[in-house]
């Protein structure tokens, strides 16, 4: 992403992979052009937001014609660095971590988990989903230039592990623990607490209708 594109709103940046995935499906089906209304219906983002998102990148479409699928796909592939592979490490090979290793982002050609770490001696030295599992105590011996880590460890251990990751040059952390981690300002961290998300969903189901949210 170039300097100008790095200034786009974070909400827009989060939607780009969603657009890219849908465009890949369109391309595979042989569709040559798509309207913002069709995109809106597919990705569940209103068409005005899609047009505004796309406007940050200049003229990507033509009024009355829509968007050329091949052009958009090529543009977003370059914007999202899809031709460069990002190696990710995973800390914690429990149930959730194991699921990640078996899945290993098979739909994302540019992202893969290259190694995992755990403290369980029965898992150390094995492979899960084709990914080698190393001793967490040897973390510093294995991390080279991997920029991203996924945390699926007990909350009590999350901060100390995070401190080690930061000292090793990790730039981004996907945190699946309930802990709210303290990191330096230059570190990007995304918290995903599945229990909180589920509780929030149940609350909205009980107290809000879908129509009320739309209004």
UniProtKB/Swiss-Prot annotation:
GO CC terms in record: cytoplasm
Subcellular location: Cytoplasm
Annotated keywords: Cytoplasm, DNA-binding, NAD, Repressor, Transcription, Transcription regulation
PANTHER family: REDOX-SENSING TRANSCRIPTIONAL REPRESSOR REX, REDOX-SENSING TRANSCRIPTIONAL REPRESSOR REX 1
Any GO BP annotation: negative regulation of DNA-templated transcription
Gene3D superfamilies with a match to the protein in the record: NAD(P)-binding Rossmann-like Domain (3.40.50.720), Winged helix-like DNA-binding domain superfamily/Winged helix DNA-binding domain (1.10.10.10)
MF (Gene Ontology): DNA binding; DNA-binding transcription factor activity
Name the record gives this protein: Redox-sensing transcriptional repressor Rex
Function text: Modulates transcription in response to changes in cellular NADH/NAD(+) redox state.
Lineage: Bacteria, Bacillati, Bacillota, Bacilli, Bacillales
A Pfam family this chain is assigned to: Put_DNA-bind_N
InterPro entries: CoA-bd, NAD(P)-bd_dom_sf, Rex_DNA-bd_C_dom, Tscrpt_rep_Rex, WH-like_DNA-bd_sf, WH_DNA-bd_sf
Main location, first listed in the record: cytoplasm
Organism, as annotated: Bacillus velezensis (strain DSM 23117 / BGSC 10A6 / LMG 26770 / FZB42)
Gene name tied to this protein: rex
NCBIfam families reported for this sequence: PRK05472.1-3 (NF003989), PRK05472.1-5 (NF003991), PRK05472.2-3 (NF003994), PRK05472.2-4 (NF003995), PRK05472.2-5 (NF003996)
Family recorded in the similarity comment: Belongs to the transcriptional regulatory Rex family.
